[in-house]
Amino acid sequence: MSKRNQVSYVRPAEPAFLSRFKERVGYKEGPTVETKKIQPQLPDEDGNHSDKEDEQPQVVVLKKGDLTAEEVMKIKAEIKAAKTDEEPPPADGRIVYRKPVKRSSDEKCSGLTASSKKKKTNEDDVNKQSSVRKNSQKQIKNSSLLSFDSEDENE
């Protein structure tokens, strides 16, 4: 069994006529098994690679309340600062779960207003329409049904 683990493949030398032919044609060797396993260097995942000056979106201010380029840069800086404020993962590699911060009732409903009166009137209209449809269907079914008298059944 130990000899089986020591087996390896040795690639034989390429014949001279093949090497001359490849040289004339300009053949480039493809990836081998060893070169396929090598991982390419990936850029840093900081998000800076897409924030180059020429790759940034164009900022157009149409109205008075629109964001300007300076305001966008401030918001991006705040987001980056918030990301850096997060705690680094623990050294021992354990995942720690924490309860989310509870929001106050003002934050939950900020900007949301709903009137139940409108919903109720819509629901009532839908219910009335469905009940009218059901009644008309019952009348149609009742008229199409055959009825037998009890006298006919006795005979």
UniProtKB/Swiss-Prot annotation:
Phosphoserine PTM positions: S50, S130, S147, S150
Biased composition annotated in UniProt, kind: Polar residues: 128-147
InterPro entries assigned: DUF4604, KIAA1143-like
Keywords tagged on the record: Acetylation, Phosphoprotein
Disulfide pairings: none
Residues bearing PTM N6-acetyllysine: K108
Residue numbers spanned by region Disordered: 24-63, 80-155
PANTHER family: GEO02494P1
Protein name as it appears in the record: Uncharacterized protein KIAA1143 homolog
